[in-house]
């Protein structure tokens, strides 16, 4: 093999290494460096907004903005004081107002704002036990919150008050008793987030 071919081969290998390295640095990549679990995202046209668990940090419930679901910028803090570990929030928009439902210190709360960038209200405590609240509007036009263990509770029209007792409406898939699992079956019914599309409700 002559020197010209060797030079071309070396240049080709170097180019391949550069392309591979460039791809590795750009995609896939870490979107948010740090501890930002349990994201809840809504879309408004070309804009996406997100919040996540903030646990024992205050101010908490950081609100993020993105136009591509890759690059996120913090724009607000929805929770100004700490009332317990905050986790598994649900960010929703209903009739022009933004709400974040979240559990903390053995209870459920909601904060709200007319502008996603704030100001956000003080926390409103809801008369509802359970964790991981998920907001949904029923076919009857009424508002509800799902919580863990397949339970649901009705909300007032403004979304700031529970108007009736919660009841179990979904018991999940009963896996075989001979399976070895951690804890009881109902402990896996957590984090209900709901979506209504084309006449169907989806729970994830």
PLM regions: where:
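Carbohydrate-active catalytic/glycan-binding domains of CAZyme proteins
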Residues: 24-204
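Bacterial Sec-dependent N-terminal signal peptides
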Residues: 1-26
